[in-house]
């Protein structure tokens, strides 16, 4: 079923993130998280003749939202949809003959569509197959991880990607339960892990559990790293990077690249002790959703927007 863009995903920090791009005439812009098309639609509304927008999304469901954007003929000519993981940003820009870009926007995390889809296993609210793939054409599933990973590897991803303090005990219980069952649905997982979560924190901890599996399934941190490094190379001097994150792992990586120019956050200095970084921070403090937006869209509560501008070569 084709959904409207608004139903698919309500764009978070829409005005703030688009203003952060500082869009100008004849610019080339990239939205690496098309989703419901909300951010892309707003960018297109500000583009003029000679400008172009490339929008990425690896999910076939997202591509259907193009028809709901109501684009004019001029906007269609200025728009290219790329059905691909954004980790391949550099390759696709080379394919389209784009040497430099003037701005890149990323609204990271999972769209409302994925959380609310009762068939793909992204949420513990529904009984569904343990899939969690953004790209349904390839890759391992959450069920594969739960059934095949050894205890140590499983514990590591729960700790690193879910920040679960009981990761070792939970992993041990998951592996032990394999003797009685094969993990196929979300309920198969929940019956194993529920005893480890206090009722007061049950929903938060379950969300962290599902987050850890989703990140591993989709190689999200590796993809984000590759995209940010590519963006650093592709942005021309004065170009803007506008990124919305939803959890601490994403935010730390984005913060590091903007402040130091590398994923590790290692500060480099020149001969005179001056800090060398390719970016100038546009906002020193993260931008968060207003109280009004949080009331209208509860999923915006954890959103953090960071904006940086590529420096001129010195």
What residues fall within each predicted segment?
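S-adenosyl-L-methionine-dependent methyltransferase catalytic core, i.e., the SAM/SAH-binding region
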Residues: 1-314
């Amino acid at each position: 079923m084709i959904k409207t863009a608004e139903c698919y995903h309500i764009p978070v920090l829409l005005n703030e993130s688009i203003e952060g791009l500082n869009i100008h005439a004849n610019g080339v812009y990239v939205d690496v998280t098309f989703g419901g098309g909300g951010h892309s639609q707003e960018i297109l509304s500000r583009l003029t003749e000679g400008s172009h927008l490339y929008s990425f999304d690896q999910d076939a469901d997202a591509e259907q939202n193009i028809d709901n954007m109501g684009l004019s003929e001029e906007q269609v000519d200025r728009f290219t949809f790329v059905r691909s993981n954004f980790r391949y940003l550099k390759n696709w820009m080379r394919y389209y003959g784009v040497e430099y870009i003037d701005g890149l926007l990323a609204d990271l995390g999972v769209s409302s569509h994925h959380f609310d889809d009762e068939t793909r296993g992204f949420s513990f609210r529904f009984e569904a197959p343990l899939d969690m793939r953004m790209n349904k054409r390839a890759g391992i599933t959450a069920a594969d991880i739960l059934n095949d990973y050894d205890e140590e590897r499983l514990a590591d991803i729960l700790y690193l990607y879910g920040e679960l303090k009981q990761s070792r005990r939970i992993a041990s219980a998951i592996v032990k339960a394999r003797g009685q069952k094969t993990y196929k649905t979300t309920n198969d997982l929940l019956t194993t892990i529920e005893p480890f979560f206090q009722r007061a924190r049950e929903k938060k901890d379950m969300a962290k559990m599902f987050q850890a599996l989703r990140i591993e399934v989709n190689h999200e941190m590796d993809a984000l790293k590759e995209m940010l490094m590519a963006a650093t190379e592709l942005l021309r001097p004065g170009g803007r990077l506008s990124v919305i994150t939803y959890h601490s792992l994403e935010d730390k990586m984005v913060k590091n690249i903007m402040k130091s120019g590398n994923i590790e956050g290692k500060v480099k200095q020149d001969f005179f002790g001056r800090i060398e970084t390719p970016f100038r921070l546009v906002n020193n403090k993260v931008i968060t959703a207003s109280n009004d937006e949080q009331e209208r869209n509860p999923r915006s509560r954890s959103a953090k927007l960071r904006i940086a501008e590529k420096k001129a070569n010195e």
